[in-house]
Amino acid sequence: MQFSKMHGLGNDFMVIDGVTQNVYLTEDMIRKLADRHYGVGFDQLLLVEPPYDPELDFHYRIFNADGSEVAQCGNGARCFARFVSLKGLINRSDMYVSTAKGKMVLTLVDEENVRVNMGEPIWEPAKIPFIANKFEKNYILRTDLQTVLCGVVSMGNPHCVLQVDDIEQATVHQLGALLEKHHRFPERANVGFMQIIDRHHIKLRVFERGVGETKACGSGACAAVAVGIMQGVLDANVQVSLPGGTLQIEWQGKGKPLYMTGTATHIYDGFIKL
């Protein structure tokens, strides 16, 4: 099976063309491939499939390192766009793809950057899913470690976002693990720790569902900015500094799609026998 290794700001992926080759993967196979000592090693595996809808170009599937399938990965979407272009699966800069929970528009901006229309942030608790009687800008969540005030949103996957005073001192691993599996998130959650520098700039660390902390999380950056704008502490165009690099997020508010722009890097091509 042929594959490519790619990364978006250090969030690394094994990307597989399921259009020109037959691909069958089990959870156990994905876990073995994800092993950084005995396999290929990655945060997520991305699978390019033929479109389910004839009006679209591709179907985009994402699997975490633990083998679980998820509906969204923003950094992966940028790498997905770069991959299908590099492999000659498409010959235009705009592409239309479906995911498990919706549709996306991906645009190759230049040789480095990809712009992703992430769609509208989802705030309705039942659709996130998140257990709450109604939408609130802030929710109180209690854990064994501490009680936190957070925003909750879906960018195609559930996100919990909390503000911290110092990103370096944030208890990302301990608190992130507790909030990821909090009982109010039936499908678990990605947990973002956001330090606001000013209304146009934040620092962010993300504990990803099924993965742990990664160098960068595109949907997490989108979620953090959406929450910050909804809470009135950020403006419409925000630079997000992650451990792996920088993303630019734009959102004009409710009823409008959110856009993410950032790099997508091809590392190498490989072949592996399954």
From Swiss-Prot:
Q: List the active-site residues.
A: 73 (proton donor), 217 (proton acceptor)
Q: Which Gene3D superfamilies does the protein's record reference?
A: Diaminopimelate Epimerase, Chain A, domain 1
Question: Where is the protein situated, by its record's location annotation?
Answer: Cytoplasm
**Keywords assigned by UniProt, alphabetized:** Amino-acid biosynthesis, Cytoplasm, Isomerase, Lysine biosynthesis
* Domain of life, source organism: Bacteria
The residues forming the signal peptide are none
Q: Where is this site: Could be important to modulate the pK values of the two catalytic cysteine residues?
A: 159, 208
List the GO biological process terms. lysine biosynthetic process via diaminopimelate
Q: Which pathway does the database say it acts in?
A: Amino-acid biosynthesis; L-lysine biosynthesis via DAP pathway; DL-2,6-diaminopimelate from LL-2,6-diaminopimelate: step 1/1
Recorded GO cellular component terms are: cytosol
Q: Does the record's keyword annotation contain Amino-acid biosynthesis?
A: yes
E.C. number(s) listed in UniProt: 5.1.1.7
Molecular function in Gene Ontology: diaminopimelate epimerase activity
Assembly = Homodimer.
**Stated family:** Belongs to the diaminopimelate epimerase family.
Function, in words: Catalyzes the stereoinversion of LL-2,6-diaminopimelate (L,L-DAP) to meso-diaminopimelate (meso-DAP), a precursor of L-lysine and an essential component of the bacterial peptidoglycan.
According to UniProt, the name of this protein is Diaminopimelate epimerase
Lineage in the entry?
Bacteria, Pseudomonadati, Pseudomonadota, Gammaproteobacteria, Pasteurellales
